[in-house]
């Protein structure tokens, strides 16, 4: 529940304009087309030199945009307003001239008295920020010589002009700013994403409150001016830092936050992210700290380059002595892991950088360069990275394995990348390191998670009472359907639907009793429990198709073409991995191969001693994994038949067929 100081609607409503006014701006119109004679004629006739167009562009703005010195002189002589601003962005003529890198216009406007520290709104950029983007060093020099702060900060992210120039690879202005004393190690601010999420929610609430007042609760459509007033009301939440109290979910449904903040980037980090090698060189030569980490997730320039597939930039940073072992403080990603992951980026909810395709250096070259520089081949992840995350599925990875505890070798195995695995073993990587097992409560199936959520919802009396009668009936019957037939017989469905509130408690008690009984049942795999932090998924599981039996989108992760059998053969014959090794859910490699219908790999594993009779912790045989183990996976009859022939039992529990 959100508790905030309520705002008065009047403060927002008074901002609404009473009506649109047709703007006449003949001088600005003529200036836009560069018609100097028409401008002179209009001014002689008494036209207003400062009458702006609808977007706020005045004649002086257009002179600055065009770089027309003759036009500018006429306008200045006629009394043109130096600080006139556009309606959107509040750009002054000096901002426009600086953005275009027109040094003559900038000099003239400064001579005329233009404010060199004027700010755009809401971004709060100075003319120097925009000059840095222009790439024109002379423009930058004139502004600084006139008194502009070389390390000024814009309002939104507190970025300096040097950050602007570095991020866009404006080498000339980068060098000029550095010569003029710009600090190459100043970072932008970091944003607390959790706090921002709370403020976003409050801003939306305020906007809706204002719109509701304007539209009489939806009876008519708001005008653009009214919408603007609602937006302004929402912005107040950010400026005030509204106090927000969240309703937190049960601890049983909490998971580690995978990204807490963003930002905090230096000019070097920006240049590394974009792969601007020349800018990187210039920054380092001027004292940029090569291993300075960003404020968002503790990423170095080398790691930033590797994550984004900027392998040429990574090579340059290594030549300058970047430390290959500084991992992200957020999730433990190392440059070595990032190099493998960049080559085999999964298709997640986040757009994945494709710059690796245009690099002179390949990922294997960068991996070897990192190892030669002393990279630890066994650096382990401390948290699954946020950019390998899906949404809209029964689990947060949507079928991708949880990379917590993974090494670069496990990541290469998951990509069925024999070349990367062989390179890593050459440099001493331990192929037997597995990912870390999560807490036992987080190993539930999707169905188990859904049921637990439904039971918890039924147990919340306040939320239940807020439901409609039909929703209450659905909530109770959903749990009732999973009860034993002997119990259901004494609780007729029609009675429950007629009076769900009266049956809520008794159905809930039966469900909890049943869950307690199920929890005491022995593990069908016969395996000892794996504690939290123990071994979860090993390289041989990753290379044989772990997770494919779940049928989520993430199971279609990118990997080397036709790499399943070669990868497993490498792990068994060259590394010596056990074909019967179980993952934390009790599956062996035959289970995973069966879920994909990979008969060739199944036969190889059996030839090497693989146990087709193994049963998982969920009671699934190897044949079951090929027989529609979940409703999203179609049965593969040929694989079922093969496994039965090899000795696997078949539970005949095709969930797809039901």
Describe each PLM feature range.
Residues 29-33, 62-68, 96-102, 130-136, ...:
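Ankyrin repeat A-helix N-terminal signature
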Residues 24-29, 52-58, 85-92, 119-126, ...:
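Ankyrin-repeat boundary/"N-cap" motif
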Residues 10-19:
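Bacterial N-terminal signal peptides
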Residues 612-653:
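Leucine-rich solenoid repeat scaffolds
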Residues 206-249, 450-525:
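Long intrinsically disordered, low-complexity regions that are acidic and Ser/Thr-rich
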Residues 22-62, 267, 271, 279-282, ...:
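N-terminal segments that cap or nucleate solenoid repeat domains
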Residues 35-43, 68-76, 102-110, 136-144, ...:
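Ankyrin repeat structural motif
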């Amino acid at each position: 529940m959100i508790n905030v100081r309520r705002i008065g609607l009047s403060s927002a409503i008074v901002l609404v304009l009473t009506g649109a006014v047709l703007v006449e701006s003949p001088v600005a119109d003529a200036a836009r087309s560069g018609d100097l004679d028409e401008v002179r004629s209009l001014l002689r006739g008494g036209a207003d030199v400062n009458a702006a167009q609808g977007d706020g562009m005045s004649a002086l703005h257009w002179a600055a945009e065009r770089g027309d010195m003759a036009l500018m002189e006429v306008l200045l002589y006629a009394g043109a307003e130096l600080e006139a601003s556009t309606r959107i962005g509040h750009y002054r003529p000096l901002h426009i001239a600086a953005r275009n890198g027109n040094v003559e216009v900038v000099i003239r406007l400064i001579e005329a008295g233009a404010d060199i520290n004027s700010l755009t709104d809401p971004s709060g950029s100075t003319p120097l920020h925009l000059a840095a983007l222009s790439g024109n060093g002379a423009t930058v020099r004139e502004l600084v010589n006139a008194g502009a702060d070389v390390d000024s900060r814009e309002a939104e992210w507190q970025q300096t002009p040097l950050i602007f120039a570095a991020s866009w690879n404006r080498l000339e202005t980068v060098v000029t700013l550095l010569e003029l004393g710009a600090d190459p190690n100043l970072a932008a601010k970091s944003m607390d994403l959790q706090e921002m999420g709370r403020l976003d929610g409050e801003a939306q609430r305020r906007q809706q409150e204002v719109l509701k007042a304007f539209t009489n609760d939806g009876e008519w459509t708001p005008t653009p001016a009214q919408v603007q007033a609602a937006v302004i009301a929402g912005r107040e939440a950010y400026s005030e830092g509204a106090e927000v109290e969240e309703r937190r979910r049960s601890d049983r449904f909490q998971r580690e936050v995978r990204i807490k903040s963003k930002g905090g980037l230096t000019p070097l980090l920006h240049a590394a992210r974009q792969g601007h090698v020349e800018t990187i060189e210039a920054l380092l030569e001027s004292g940029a700290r090569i291993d300075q980490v960003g404020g968002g997730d503790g990423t170095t320039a080398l790691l930033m380059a590797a994550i984004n597939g900027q392998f040429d930039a990574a090579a340059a940073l290594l030549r300058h002595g970047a430390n290959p072992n500084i991992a992200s403080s957020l999730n433990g990603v190392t440059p070595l892991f990032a190099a493998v992951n960049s080559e085999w980026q999964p298709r997640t909810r986040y757009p994945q950088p494709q710059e690796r395709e245009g690099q002179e250096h390949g990922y294997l070259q960068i991996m070897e360069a990192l190892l030669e520089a002393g990279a630890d081949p066994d650096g382990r992840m401390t948290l699954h990275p946020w950019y390998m995350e899906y949404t809209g599925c029964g689990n947060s990875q949507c079928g991708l394995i949880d990379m917590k505890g993974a090494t670069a070798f496990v990541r290469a195995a998951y990509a069925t990348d024999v070349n990367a695995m062989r390179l890593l073993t050459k440099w001493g990587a331990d192929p037997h390191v597995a990912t870390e097992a999560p807490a036992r409560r987080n190993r539930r199936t999707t169905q188990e998670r859904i049921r637990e959520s439904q039971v918890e919802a039924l147990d919340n009396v306040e939320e239940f009472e807020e439901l409609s009668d039909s929703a209450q009936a659905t909530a109770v019957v959903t749990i009732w359907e999973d009860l034993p037939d002997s119990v259901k017989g004494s609780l007729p469905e029609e009675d429950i639907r007629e009076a769900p509130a009266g049956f809520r408690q008794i159905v809930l008690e039966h469900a909890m009793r049943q869950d307690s009984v199920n929890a005491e049942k022995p593990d069908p795999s016969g395996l000892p429990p794996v504690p939290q932090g123990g071994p979860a998924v090993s390289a041989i599981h990753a290379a044989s198709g772990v997770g494919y039996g779940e049928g989520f989108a993430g199971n279609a992760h990118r990997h080397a073409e036709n790499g399943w059998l070669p990868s497993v053969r490498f792990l068994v014959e060259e590394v010596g991995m056990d074909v019967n090794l179980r993952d934390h859910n009790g599956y062996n490699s035959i289970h995973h191969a069966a879920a994909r219908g990979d008969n060739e790999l199944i036969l190889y594993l059996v030839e090497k001693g693989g146990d087709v009779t193994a049963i998982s912790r969920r009671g699934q045989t190897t044949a079951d994994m090929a027989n529609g183990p979940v409703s999203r996976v179609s049965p593969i009859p040929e694989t079922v038949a093969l496994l039965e022939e090899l000795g696997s039992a078949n539970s005949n529990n095709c969930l797809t067929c039901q």
